[in-house]
């Protein structure tokens, strides 16, 4: 690129109508001049060629992505990980904020991702390592999306559960049980105090546990538990499947008693979820398979916060995400980034309920609550309820007992002295 070419991909905020731009934060490592590398990054994701041969024209003022901010630090030791790079020159670690005109692709998630996470970004000259750290949308862009139908307030209203976390449970054994014993486990967990008993993300519509039969039995169990406890309950059915079956499975599950639906967001596709949102009559709940493949590495891929924002944009009312436990291998600051992405203002898009999960139990509830900093979250044990030594009802009860202690300002171990279900949970799971 010539100096004039490079200059065409830089702008000041004051010179742009920011309502027309999505802002993107990237971290990248480059070989050669960082200013040229950042210009290439803008060019490749927008106007890779900005004029026709023989024409006096320039498409960059309207169509080019533009650098708003750039910082660069030399890396004398080279790239942070061994990587192929055809470019030569000093290596720099860079942080850039780019304004990308959303008129290039419109309010369409597949086209958005094709631009800001596509070939142009991950094959930009001189940049072998790059991570999209954040994405911010202007209000006119957000206005084209419906977002969550129910959001946090709607989910709480359905459960009549206010001023406390929402208590989920993953029915386990998660794979292998036929519908009848599976439903019995759900029933026990509801009577013990769960708000929502759910299918595992890997249990879908299979011949040995068909969704219609499973939903009918769990729907009946859910209604019985609600009547017996006097508290609303929800069965969360997994309808993850091929896109052309989503509306059919929605109708089957809801007609048979499911009060919410689980969809594995990235395997199914966010555009499919947006389509389903227009049809859905119950809350939609996201699970996180496939996301770590994008987000795990600190210097390459896509920050999971971006995925969280996109799931909210597509219409999920609840987003289950990797939580604070060591098994989840997610830095605490990244979990908190994702929680904020669910809760913070996003134009007309309703907040969605964050559910940080992974190997949780009554023994971890207080830690999760303190880290989140409010009661606006979901708590989703699996074995912490269904592997409780006294059974699923006691496992669910132990969760509620732990919350009662936290809400009353009583140390959880002290409360356990007079609550055997909680005491058993702390003994069984306290070392995790």
Swiss-Prot record:
InterPro entries: RuBisCO (IPR033966), RuBisCO_lsu_C (IPR000685), RuBisCO_lsu_C_sf (IPR036376), RuBisCO_lsu_fd_N (IPR017443), RuBisCO_lsu_N_sf (IPR036422). Mg(2+) binds at residues 198, 200-201. GO terms for biological process: carbon fixation. It comes from the Bacteria. CDD domains: RLP_Photo (cd08208). Its cofactor is Mg(2+). GO terms for molecular function: magnesium ion binding; ribulose-bisphosphate carboxylase activity. Binds 1 Mg(2+) ion per subunit. Keywords: Magnesium, Metal-binding. It holds the Pfam family RuBisCO_large. Transmembrane segments: none annotated. The modification N6-carboxylysine is found at residue 198. Belongs to the RuBisCO large chain family. Type IV subfamily. This is Ribulose bisphosphate carboxylase-like protein 2. It comes from Rhodopseudomonas palustris (strain ATCC BAA-98 / CGA009). The gene is rlp2.
């Amino acid at each position: 690129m010539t100096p004039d070419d490079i200059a065409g991909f830089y702008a000041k905020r004051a010179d742009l109508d920011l309502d027309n731009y999505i802002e993107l934060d990237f971290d990248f490592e480059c070989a050669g001049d960082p200013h040229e590398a950042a210009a290439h990054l803008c060019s490749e994701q927008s106007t890779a060629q900005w004029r026709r041969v023989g024409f006096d024209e320039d498409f960059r003022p309207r169509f080019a992505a533009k650098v708003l901010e750039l910082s660069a630090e030399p890396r004398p030791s080279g790239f942070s990980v061994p990587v192929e790079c055809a470019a030569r020159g000093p290596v720099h670690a860079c942080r850039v904020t780019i304004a990308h005109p959303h008129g290039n692709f419109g309010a369409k998630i597949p086209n958005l991702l094709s631009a800001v996470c596509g070939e142009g970004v991950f094959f930009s000259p001189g940049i072998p390592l790059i991570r999209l750290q954040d994405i911010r949308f202007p209000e006119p862009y957000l206005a084209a999306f419906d977002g969550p139908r129910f959001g946090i307030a709607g989910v709480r209203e359905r459960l009549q559960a206010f001023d406390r976390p929402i208590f989920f449970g993953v029915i386990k054994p998660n794979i292998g049980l036929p519908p009848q014993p599976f439903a019995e486990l759900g029933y026990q967990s509801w009577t013990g105090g769960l708000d929502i008993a759910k299918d595992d993300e890997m249990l879908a519509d299979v011949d040995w546990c068909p969704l219609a039969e499973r939903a009918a039995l769990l729907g009946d169990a859910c209604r019985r538990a609600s009547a017996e406890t006097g508290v609303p309950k929800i069965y969360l059915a997994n309808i993850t499947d091929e896109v052309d079956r989503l509306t059919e499975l929605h109708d089957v599950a809801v007609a048979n008693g499911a009060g919410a639906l689980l969809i594995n967001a990235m395997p199914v596709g966010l555009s499919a979820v947006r389509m389903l949102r227009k049809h859905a009559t119950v809350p939609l709940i996201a699970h996180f398979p496939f996301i770590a493949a994008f987000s795990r590495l600190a210097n390459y891929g896509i920050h999971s916060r971006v995925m969280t924002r996109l799931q909210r944009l597509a219409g999920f009312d609840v987003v289950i995400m990797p939580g604070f436990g060591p098994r989840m291998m997610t830095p605490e600051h990244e979990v908190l980034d994702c929680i904020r992405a669910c809760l913070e203002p996003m134009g007309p898009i309703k907040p969605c309920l964050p559910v940080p999960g992974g190997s949780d139990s009554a023994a971890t509830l207080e830690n999760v609550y303190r880290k989140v900093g409010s009661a606006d979250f979901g708590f989703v044990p699996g074995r912490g309820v269904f592997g409780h030594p006294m059974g699923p009802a006691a496992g669910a009860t132990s969760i509620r007992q732990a919350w009662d202690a936290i809400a009353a300002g009583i140390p959880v171990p002290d409360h356990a002295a007079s609550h055997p279900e909680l005491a058993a949970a702390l003994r069984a799971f306290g070392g995790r």
